[in-house]
Amino acid sequence: MPFQKTIKSEISLTGIGIHTGKKINLNLIPAQRDTGIVFYRKDRNFPIKAKLPFVVDTSFATTLGVDGIKIRTVEHLLATLHVFGITNVFIEIDSSEIPVMDGSAIDFTKAILKAGIAKQGKTVSLFKITKPVYYEESHSKIFAKPYRGFKITYKIFYEHPLIMEQSLSIEINEQNFLNDIAPARTFGFLKDINYLLKNGFAKGGSLDNALVLDEKGVVGGNLRFKDEFVRHKILDAIGDLSLIGYPIQGHFIIEKGGHTSHINFLRKLIETGCYELAEEPYFNFQLSAQAV
């Protein structure tokens, strides 16, 4: 059984909200066991738990909300917390969005490893897929099946010469996340920028925090991986799937997915009951024990 965990010391980061364009101060604070992952809007004096029922929007990011108070773009930070097994932490922000940092999860990953991770002497159940589950909407398809571990197979297709069809299948553990997933940046297309801005998105987007593609390639930068695009989609998927609220056992096969299909799939998964909260050994490579 995995143990509940928190961070050993407080983390403070500052960055820009990719959609709001605002400067945001972010603090991660250790929390007692059984607290869960709790976002706290300091500017509104309001907490929101990182749980599936509180997802209120999935337009170009995953947004949590209660009573009209929202926190946008939670997926990269949640993915990092999930992979490193952090189950209890307060996340304080002074605005309505998690800072995008460089568009990836690498800054969050480095900060958490530097702060250290503490076991809290109490176990947490596993969310274990027990029967195959299939979901389809528009062009997106998601299939989950039982698996001894946590694995994601992702396939994307974009009519762009740098992307076209990309696919990757990867075990989700700390080492693979640090090396292969966390550094992958969010991406968008130059042709879509006017639409995004007109509709209140990407006000803080720049070449410093996103891969921007014109008709031929990346504008003003280079790829970290040849298949950085599908790797980033896996990062998003981990963050969205983490809203289940438990460590996950299962193999998730996703084709042309996005935040909306990820979240709708989770809702169907809960409805079908093809899972159990299990108490058994959890196989996940532990990098944090070596790094703290």
UniProtKB/Swiss-Prot annotation:
Its cofactor is Zn(2+). It comes from the Bacteria. GO terms for biological process: lipid A biosynthetic process. Zn(2+) binds at H76, H232, D236. Keywords: Hydrolase, Lipid A biosynthesis, Lipid biosynthesis, Lipid metabolism, Metal-binding, Zinc. Its EC number is 3.5.1.108. Transmembrane segments: none annotated. GO terms for cellular component: membrane. GO terms for molecular function: metal ion binding; UDP-3-O-acyl-N-acetylglucosamine deacetylase activity. Pathway: Glycolipid biosynthesis; lipid IV(A) biosynthesis; lipid IV(A) from (3R)-3-hydroxytetradecanoyl-[acyl-carrier-protein] and UDP-N-acetyl-alpha-D-glucosamine: step 2/6. The active site is at H259. Gene3D superfamilies: lpxc deacetylase, domain 1, lpxc deacetylase, domain 2. It catalyses: a UDP-3-O-[(3R)-3-hydroxyacyl]-N-acetyl-alpha-D-glucosamine + H2O = a UDP-3-O-[(3R)-3-hydroxyacyl]-alpha-D-glucosamine + acetate. HAMAP family: LpxC. Catalyzes the hydrolysis of UDP-3-O-myristoyl-N-acetylglucosamine to form UDP-3-O-myristoylglucosamine and acetate, the committed step in lipid A biosynthesis. Belongs to the LpxC family. This is UDP-3-O-acyl-N-acetylglucosamine deacetylase. The gene is lpxC.
